């Protein structure tokens, strides 16, 4: 049986741009949905499609807790998290497929 993973991810409209934090059990599919604008809401209206950060979890409960905490963070903390792992704000989506 294949191990199930869950992901907390951050999408950006560009370097230093608008940010979106989400959680999913299928990172490739979910980011693709955002990129293709099949997801209604904030990411669609603000052209947020660049995957700049993600974390993997083994259980959904911990992933949801992390997502909720990150959503409450100050913007500067989110930017530091991104830049510590991805200083150029590269789109990480291509590395997943």
Residue ranges and their predicted role:
Residues 1-39, 44-68, 85-87, 92-97:
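GIY-YIG nuclease catalytic motif and its immediate N-terminal context
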Residues 68-82:
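Short arginine-rich
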